[in-house]
Amino acid sequence: MKIVQTVEEVRAEIKKWRRENLTVGLVPTMGYLHEGHKSLIDRAVAENDRVVVSVFVNPMQFGPSEDLESYPRDLERDAALCEEAGANLIFHPEPENMYSSDFSSFIDMNTLTGGLCGKTRPTHFRGVCTVVGKLFHIVEPDKAYFGQKDAQQLAVIRHMVKDLNFNLEVVGCPIIREEDGLAKSSRNTYLNKEERQAALVLSRSLDAAKAQIEAGERNAAILKKNICSIIEAEPLARIDYVEFVDWNTLEPVETIEGPVLNAIAVYIGKTRLIDNHIYFEKEGNQ
């Protein structure tokens, strides 16, 4: 497995692979990899001849008061996980490798980004779309892999690929959870012992809504109210949003008629965590 920093080095490797008619999978990450990321790499390895993992804490998707400087970084640890999973190349650029001093071109979207995380992080998805678009141009993968935990990001990237005619398939992969139900996240490392326990309120509230839906409840307002009451009972938790939206348009829904995304964002202490369930009721699964 190789680790490279420049666009030219990545393209040189890709060129060699393409000469051999090998398929290429891309797993874009911000590093500090965990079992959730490993599940993406595992799937990419299973479905492609060669796999590139990008490890880049993208400054463009962080707001001015967010955790860019404190976001955890450990390339040695990331490389060990990637190698064990069977990745072939890590692309680990410095910011100046991705954004020149006079960089001024961005990918923005008028739909899908105004609600959910976009409501309180107004420049976030412009940064996400721009860096992912650049990675798609640099690597030119056959398939790119994203986790369902960042459900809005997954929907946005799929829409961008369709709008801009990127010649690749976006593959969404299931959320990977800790044994007690907490969705795996690099930001879980911010939590102290008490906060880690409090964070279980996210999956607990979503599971309660899931049970209600399975029992026949279809009113989004009732479900939302019950989720909020569970979260508000946890002293360390503060709700950013609780929403039920159409999974294709991300527009709010009043009735649960799949496919519907139930997405939540909650502050546990100072740490903002997200989680979700997706309901595909017409297909009879999630």
Label the model's feature ranges.
Residues N226-Q286:
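Phosphate/ribose-recognition catalytic cores of enzymes acting on nucleotide-derived substrates
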Residues K2-L236, V245-W247, I278:
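Nucleotidyltransferase catalytic core that binds NTPs
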